[in-house]
UniProtKB/Swiss-Prot annotation:
This is Probable tRNA sulfurtransferase. Belongs to the ThiI family. The gene is thiI. It is found in: Cytoplasm. Its main location: cytoplasm.
Amino acid sequence: MMKYDHILVRYGEMTTKGKNRSKFVSTLKDNVKFKLKKFPNIKINATHDRMYIELNGEDHEAIAESLKDVFGIHKFNLAMKVPSELEEIKKGALAAFLLIKKPVKTFKITVHRSYKHFPMQTMELLPEIGGYVLENTEDIMVDVHNPDVNIRIEIRSGYSYIMCDERMGAGGLPVGVGGKVMVLLSGGIDSPVAAYLTMKRGVSVEAVHFHSPPFTSERAKQKVIDLAQELTKYCKRVTLHLVPFTEVQKTINKEIPSSYTMTVMRRMMMRITERIAEERNALAITTGESLGQVASQTLDSMHTINEVTNYPVLRPLITMDKLEIIKIANEIGTYDISIRPYEDCCTVFTPANPATKPKREKASRFEAKYDFTPLLEQAVANTETMVLQTVDKAEEDQFEDLF
């Protein structure tokens, strides 16, 4: 029985990039190669308009499952490559149709003849191929307007592609074409979604997490590591910077009026993140803030917090409500990790009545009464950095079985 031997990838938004298109295509090819490195027999050919993945016996479903998380892919088709001969095309169309797993009652044939010397015209091919499918199936009808399946055939010189199983890609742009940002990764629901949406725009991310032992536990730290690990599904790797924040936070709570401790804490986080960003050649800072969600996420708060950094602060979730954010978190696999009941440093020292309209002048005046510089430098110097890469699910299961 014939089976899929190719996957054809369509780029989507990348096609609008003009002179930079070759860079985008090259980056996408590198990302796909990295994502599919566990399939040693495949061959990848990335052209100006499309990417062709030759399977060479590898499992098409496993490859399709990996491809769906690669940013820069609009859609992809499971395909068969057959000689450009009528009988072979007919057999291929039937075989592709029979591989469809969902219930199908109607179909249509679409033919694109880029090889104009093929001996039959498109309007001659449609009934010929469609009739062959009808003759060899039962309870199936042709519906050219709203079919359950569209059997698409591309006829070229020497060979043709036949496809009818179309899958959606992740969309966006290839990770790596848009520079690098530092993402404040708290361990909550919002910040992993912000990281995901930032990567979707082609930006590489490194994560910064502030932890305050013994007020925050090792389990809370592991939760953030697991979140960063989950995000590697969408890129080659995530570098995670774990910043010890205990002394800074204790000093803030001692020296700063309680209504401003949250604001000053955020300002200190921004200062530390900016220093790490400078060392790592990042160009911006991403946060998971959503306008009005909590006291520290009002416009006044953001205005006051932004004062301490010259870096652009990206807020992908700024107009989303909580349910929209949770929906994405569920889709990308971070929600169940985020809701593990472990405290982070933003919640263990939460004041009873935080200022919702903090002023820059007040925050600066409160900070000026104590020299925080040595504490910030110590936090940066003692930051632990780890690099996380995608773990194959089968390998992960095998590892867990050892215990």
